[in-house]
Amino acid sequence: MAGHSQFKNIMHRKGRQDAVRSKMFSKLAREITVAAKSGTPDPSMNPRLRLAIQNAKAVSMPKDNIQRAINKASMGDAENYEAVRYEGYGPGGVAVIVEALTDNRNRSASNVRAAFTKAGGAMGETGSVSFMWDRVGEIYYPASAGSADKVMEAAIEAGADDVESDEEGHTIYCAFENLGEVSKALEAALGEAESVKLIWRPQNNVPVDEERAQSLMKLVATLEDDDDVQSVYANFEVDDETLAKLSAA
């Protein structure tokens, strides 16, 4: 079975072709500003800011944009964004977690609820689905970082818990409290990662057919298109044949 992480790769490839880059940069800038405001504007002293900058650089966000986002926090010119989490069910009973940074909780909740409803799902209370997930660190390297064996060896040495490798690259998982330590050790062995972040990893996935997978893709895309939404997670999987069809679509 092809997991949700592979399915997300399809969406990300399509996104690079179709999405407006300014929207991606806007979301990254918001995380940088919030990270800088929550601690010091010096990334060497602020782990959250350091990771936010690293992830922005990985998608070629201009240095001026990054610095402007940091300055916005240090000059006290930042909106009062807060982190919120929404949970619910999409088509086929698939559990969905939505993370957002917003300056208006009512607006964000209304938009997320509308997306769930339009897709035939329903938004629930906080905690309604998150018990089916684990909060973990995720570190991603492209295939060029090395062979699966090389990355596995480096991950074990760094104290990671799991590695998934395919033709696209290597996804390394670790305990959320060890993310900084593990990513630093991996950087020494493999170079700078393409992304380093905290994620929700499903304990189990729900198998879905092609029609339902398309509905879920549409729901996730709608949610990710919202300016306040930073991340979307869904616990489903599709078989290899369906994955191939979706990749070709």
UniProtKB/Swiss-Prot annotation:
Q: Write out the GO biological process terms.
A: regulation of DNA-templated transcription
- UniProt keyword Methyltransferase, yes or no: no
Taxonomic superkingdom: Bacteria
Q: Where in the cell is it found?
A: Cytoplasm
For this record, an example GO cellular component is: cytosol
Q: Which SUPFAM superfamilies does this one have?
A: YebC-like (SSF75625)
Q: Which UniProt keywords apply?
A: Cytoplasm, DNA-binding, Transcription, Transcription regulation
The keyword Transferase is annotated on this UniProt entry = no
UniProt GO molecular function: DNA binding
Which residues belong to the signal peptide in this entry?
Answer: none
The family line of this record is: Belongs to the TACO1 family.
Q: What is this protein called?
A: Probable transcriptional regulatory protein mll3945
Q: Which organism is it from?
A: Mesorhizobium japonicum (strain LMG 29417 / CECT 9101 / MAFF 303099)
